[in-house]
Amino acid sequence: MRHGVDPQARYGYLPWIVGFSRLPPCSPSDRIHDMAGHILIVDDDVIFRTLAAELLASMDFDVLDEAADGQQALVLVAGRCPDAILLDISLPGSDGFTLAPLLAAACPGAKIVLISAGIDYVPAEVLQTCAADAFLPKQELAVADLSALLTA
């Protein structure tokens, strides 16, 4: 069965902001480099995570892991750092703007791409402030140049 991303679909919601404790950064030996393009997908919608993982796999990326919320993402990166992180802005108990700097501190050098179904644009100043490298509306995931976003 073939899957795709419905450009009309809307995922997620806008939650309140909460903080997380800081995690120690991954050491270079913790980063996985046996294949190019190890990705962590952080999104509360299991259907979106599944579709995104299939799309990334079809583009020869290796989906290292998936997280349904910020706390789970922080636990996952404590053990091993991905090369890139697709991070939903709207998550239960937190948001991508708050979580991005914590993930960037835990995994220096990992590309962080914020994604959202409810927001179409994030100014560059906001991306820089929250330590994200790029923003991509979820509706554009299937047509975006993910190789450039995730490995540039």
Which stretches of residues belong to each language-model region?
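Acidic catalytic/metal-coordinating carboxylates
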Residues: 69-72, 95-98
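Active-site residues of response regulator receiver
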Residues: 88
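Two-component/phosphorelay signaling modules centered on CheY-like receiver
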Residues: 46-65
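Hydrophobic/aromatic residues positioned on beta-strands within the core alpha/beta folds
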Residues: 115-116
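The feature encodes the CheY-like receiver
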Residues: 92
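Alpha4 helix (beta4-alpha4-beta5 surface) of REC/receiver domains from two-component response regulators
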Residues: 98, 119-136, 140-148
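Short amphipathic alpha-helix used as the core "switch/output" element in two-component signaling
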Residues: 97-109
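Conserved sequence signature across two-component system core domains
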Residues: 42-43, 67, 85
